Amino acid sequence: MDVTFTPLDPAGADRDALVALLTENAWPFHTRPRVTRPEAEKAVDGGAWEDEDHRTFWIEHPEHGRVGVVRLEDLTDPTPLFDLRVAERFRGRGLGAQILTALTRRVFETMPAVDRFEGQTREDNVPMLRTFRRAGWVKEAHYRRGWPVDGGEPLASVAYAMLRQDWASGTTTPVPADVDAPPPAGRKEGAAAGGRAPDWPLPTARLTLRPHREDDFGWLQEMYTQPEVVRHL
């Protein structure tokens, strides 16, 4: 059985349970690691968890039961985002990719206007970074010092996304290489300032160098999601 999502009523029957979840758990990778009861009640009563732009669901796991909540954000935009919160006692069990895969399917199946689904996390949230990759999402941006940290220096905010066409076809549209301004007249694209562009492939004493090709993306993604590689990234 798959992970399912139950619509949540923050202003009614589910208010107390939502406030309890927010205040009884630590959220070390969110902007506010600890949420006080007055803060939670103010946000819930102010519509932060259910309005035109937000919709919230309980996360129902077939083995563990209700494990947390997920809030869809920017629903009036063709690229919504999400806020995933799993209760502390269910973390570290590898549930993230299951949840995100099921959530992606729900969004694309029930929201025909959505063309891409996006999420962001801070650079030190290794479990969430792994979750994105294992769910087949593609890294699109790395915003340096873009994530405010309560009482500390800002960290980078890392953005991942899933395209509807990739979800539907089971393929991956890679992010293109950096594209700068066209090279000056008389110099080939890719050439160093003081010389000509190398002739690819470029043999060396021990190996042959060549640019990445589009068909390299699959094995590169697999390599960079291996635990022994991820911990050094």
Give names to the regions the model predicted.
Residues 1-25, 56-232:
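Acyl-donor (CoA/ACP) binding surface of acyl/acetyltransferases
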Residues 26-46, 228-233:
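Conserved GNAT-fold acetyl-CoA-binding loop/helix
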